[in-house]
């Protein structure tokens, strides 16, 4: 109930703003938008209510005794198998080569920064929607959600089912402003909304977020290659990074969108292939469902009792912080939106991505973990195996040589599609908000293109350097969650106030970002600062070294950060004079703005 009460408040807020702006109503276009938004809300409400309250009460099979077989031993023991066959690795290597060739082919006509960053703004909605799936599903997604799916069942979908609450705010309030303002980057928006100082600090926050994200993805792929080939994590990360940057630095956004289209389809097909093979192995969907224990069918497993996966923590870390960051502020996401050939295509892409493809993605990334849990309950896998091994164990047990290689290729697709988006996004921010602002303001487009390519290479190298930092965490899920909870709140709060509160001042924006960053950094060393905001979630164990406190309250740090930043933003705004001499039309939410654009 907590999630739907808080999330419902955000949804209603968005609907009210959309109505006052002219986006929804009883007219033909407004009524269609109203039905769409309410349909999205109704779908998630019914689905999550069923999973939380009805599904756990349905019949469940008793835990069967594990029967050891050569196949099951090979699936769970790296020394006896677990690493595929020669055919699998031929397929995996071939996939690497195909993606590089495709990326270079589609980027061969790229001649300007407009092409490099936005692909000439010529793409249809379906291209953008499917390529966004590949960006949304990182390599970490398969592993971390399979791990949580094995431990906590269907509640692993919580991250992918939080976006309904922002649907009206994103589609009807932010998207028109973003598209018609024609900004090239998120920091540029802050520069237009306020001044160059705010733009600078927004650039710092965004670059830290995106470079860290590159590091998370490379760390994940290093873990995968360590499991499969016995490679050192760092070596595996370097190899994959070099392959990814090889086509991004050459082809830019055109290469990214076209390769991600291919990889998005690959991810969906392979993900459902895993589910289909697993359900067939068990003997049908009924057997699969019966062997998911009752608690594993809940969409919210526990509220605050388990510090490793509290639903309230996931809500604050992912639902309120990271979802806004990814959907509204992620430079890679923004560049996809702005690559559309029209606003109508942009809007269709967002709707298709959030309403149709995201629920499918939730099944794709968590499916192997659910299968592993059902297989363990059925006696096909040991129930005490490590959760981090569930993806490998389930997929190897149910697949034949060649199919396992296809699954490995899908993981590579997930990694490369996320990393290539991030690399291109970092290049855009660096060129537009750093190089042109502080290093060489009058450079030609050709020079900017060269800088963009060099930045892509540099961003990859910095991401590689970040890999050892994430190696300190127990799991990929913890590393990703702790990172996003720590770095997103200052920019998220600043953005929300900037977009929806005209009174919000430049000084308040600066204070929110700077003090927010300092406050969150302080919580690394004094985690007890988060206790009043923890909603009863246990602190958890500290890690080793100077930054050991990062592992404590790893999800609830987002609640602390959002609360502190909100308080700072409000106080400083009322302590500073309103900025009344600036025309903010088209930069903030305004009554009737959507209607004035004459769009449906």
Describe the function of each predicted region.
Residues 2-4, 13, 30, 34-38, ...:
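Membrane-embedded helix-loop-helix hairpins and adjacent transmembrane boundary segments
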Residues 12-30:
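Cytosolic-side transmembrane helix boundary signature
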